[in-house]
Amino acid sequence: MRNYSIITAFLYLNSIKGDFILNKTEILQYLTDKQIPFTKYEHEPIFSVEEGDKSNLPNREKVIRNLFLCDAKKKNFYLVSLFVHKNINLKELSEKIPSKRLSFAKQEAMEQMLEVKPGSVTPLAILNNKDKNILMIFDSELQNQTIGMHPMENTATVFLKFEDLYTLLLPHGN
């Protein structure tokens, strides 16, 4: 069995301002307001790893992919972030969490719980999860790295330090 080293951040998060849902413009302003340094690249919409690989986005190897998963009963939801080209074995991950039989959650659940469209899933969307019912899981390889992610829309990528992201998300948990 491959040994996955993961950072599990038990971040059952609220939205920032009650029912206020963050979009691309608002999350960029929020990062600025929180004095989190980031670099933003605008680009054509990227819907898949393959499309991203064909783009001219710099530091592509530092971009993360985000998997919105649920358990077999569709009662527990997880947002898993890892580097874009790292493979993951969902069976092994389910044993580490622990959760029975992980699978990809339905698009409707993603849009309702994270308020993002397909191709735009990002750890930043956890800030939109009003019901605090998503467990955020970060791969430990993200530590001490500058990582790239979509800012709520797949028409841009922002790069920021993992620790800044973690620090940003942590206060919104219980």
Which sequence ranges carry the predicted segments?
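Extended, low-hydrophobicity, polar/charged segments
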Residues: 6-174
